[in-house]
């Protein structure tokens, strides 16, 4: 026992250096006094560079979730150049799925580059915007109710971008949701909403500090109402009348060609109009035709706009000009429904 104890103590004793002799090497030291002409890496798989544009794009899509806003911004700038080459390929699906959530990005410059990217996608192929209408509506609604005031104020710009390229699909798919979201962004409480006065105060304060962004959201609201409440143009109807004999044998242009049969739609009773029902019950209402959209707008949203717009007209400026045009649009919609 005494011998083992002595050996253990020697392990922790520091050996004294002797004069003229070098320091003793450690027991686990690695000898590096050799020269190698080649180094072999057994796990190396990539030996040559690739020029595949789609493969490079897929690698860059993962950077959309990078923690650095500069990296996310530069990735979106690169995608703007690459979109015309890959918009009709399989990578377009992953591109849209990776970029659309950036509508709620906290950085302003990232949102600006995403807006440019969506504009490029719509210019190259508007059908891609129509195909991804559901996630676009989902994240636009999330941006309109976001806790960040900057994300809320920029939601109107994304709405205008989608209106330019797939406006008719947007008004049919999310008429009530977009109107409710825009009123929330502008700070206008709605009657019958679950949280009518919950977030109105903060939105009003933030909007008054950013008159230019308020002007953009008012313009987005005007464009959305004008497109949703207008009847189809006479020229478009005349163009559809010529191939009426064989049109029923072709692929439909609208997403729900048999909606007029109302097979999966809950109809309201004849004595209960859509405008008379609470606002939170209109989420299940199908707004495929302009008449239904006008009834919903006149019953739930027109009184709110008519009460809020005159004060903006008195303030003048760009907001006052858009507010005056909105008041004229309200009268036009009222006359069209009469």
Swiss-Prot record:
It comes from the Eukaryota. One of its GO terms (molecular function) is chromatin binding. GO terms for cellular component: cytosol; nucleoplasm; nucleus; rixosome complex. The keyword Nucleus applies. It is found in: Nucleus. Its main location: nucleus. Keywords: Nucleus, Ribosome biogenesis, rRNA processing. GO terms for biological process: maturation of LSU-rRNA from tricistronic rRNA transcript (SSU-rRNA, 5.8S rRNA, LSU-rRNA); pre-replicative complex assembly involved in nuclear cell cycle DNA replication; regulation of DNA-templated DNA replication initiation; ribosomal large subunit assembly; rRNA processing. The keyword rRNA processing applies. Residues 1-25 are annotated as: Disordered. Belongs to the IPI1/TEX10 family. Component of the RIX1 complex, composed of IPI1, RIX1/IPI2 and IPI3 in a 1:2:2 stoichiometry. The complex interacts (via RIX1) with MDN1 (via its hexameric AAA ATPase ring) and the pre-60S ribosome particles. Component of the RIX1 complex required for processing of ITS2 sequences from 35S pre-rRNA. This is Pre-rRNA-processing protein IPI1. It comes from Eremothecium gossypii (strain ATCC 10895 / CBS 109.51 / FGSC 9923 / NRRL Y-1056).
